[in-house]
């Protein structure tokens, strides 16, 4: 018996679960091993950035500003990919986003801790591309790297 797939595979609960786990692991990795910076939780980075601005800790300001900027650039890159490849026949634009994300995250694994700034920027860039590319589950709004909105939406449904 064959199963019929309805809608986009990218909107399935399975993909949403995998991406959510991935997003959580990326945040845990950058926070625990790359200088206490959040890859996904940009609100946390904004709070820490503001605290370090007040304390005039300029090195830490850069540490928290870099992922914010990279996140914004990652959203823009995902949109550029969507616009350019949305009608492509051989590969879906979201597959291209995932391929870039995988390559970036693989490369980060080889970066030494002396360049955590670059590593965090790359992870935040990849996270932003994921957030921008995978925005729905079965037609409902979804953020694959943030839990609070998903928990609220899930309880509401």
Feature-to-residue mapping (PLM):
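Cytoplasmic-side transmembrane-helix entry/capping segments in multi-pass membrane proteins
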Residues: 90-99, 120-122, 143-147
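Interfacial helix-start motif at the membrane-water boundary
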Residues: 51-68
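Helix-to-loop junctions at the C-terminal end of transmembrane segments
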Residues: 75-90
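C-terminal ends and interior cores of transmembrane alpha-helices
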Residues: 99-116
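Alpha-helical transmembrane segments in multi-pass membrane proteins
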Residues: 15-23, 66, 70-74, 78, ...
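Alpha-helical transmembrane segments of multi-pass membrane proteins
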Residues: 20-38
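Short, Lys/Arg-rich, polar N-terminal cytosolic tail immediately upstream
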Residues: 1-12
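Substrate-agnostic recognition of the 12-TM MFS/MFS-like secondary transporter fold
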Residues: 44-50, 123-157
């Amino acid at each position: 018996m064959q199963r019929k797939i309805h809608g986009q595979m990218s909107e399935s609960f399975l993909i949403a679960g995998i991406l959510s786990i991935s997003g959580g692991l990326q945040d845990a990795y950058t926070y625990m091993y790359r200088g206490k910076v959040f890859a996904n939780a940009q609100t946390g980075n904004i709070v820490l950035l503001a605290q370090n601005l007040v304390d005039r800790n300029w090195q830490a300001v850069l540490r928290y500003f870099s992922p914010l900027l990279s996140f914004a650039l990652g959203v823009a890159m995902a949109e550029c990919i969507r616009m350019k490849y949305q009608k492509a026949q051989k590969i879906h634009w979201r597959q291209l986003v995932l391929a870039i994300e995988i390559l970036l995250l693989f490369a980060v694994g080889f970066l030494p801790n002396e360049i955590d700034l670059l590593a965090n920027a790359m992870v935040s860039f990849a996270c932003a591309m994921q957030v921008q590319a995978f925005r729905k589950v079965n037609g409902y709004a979804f953020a694959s790297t943030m839990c609070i909105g998903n928990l609220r939406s899930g309880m509401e449904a």
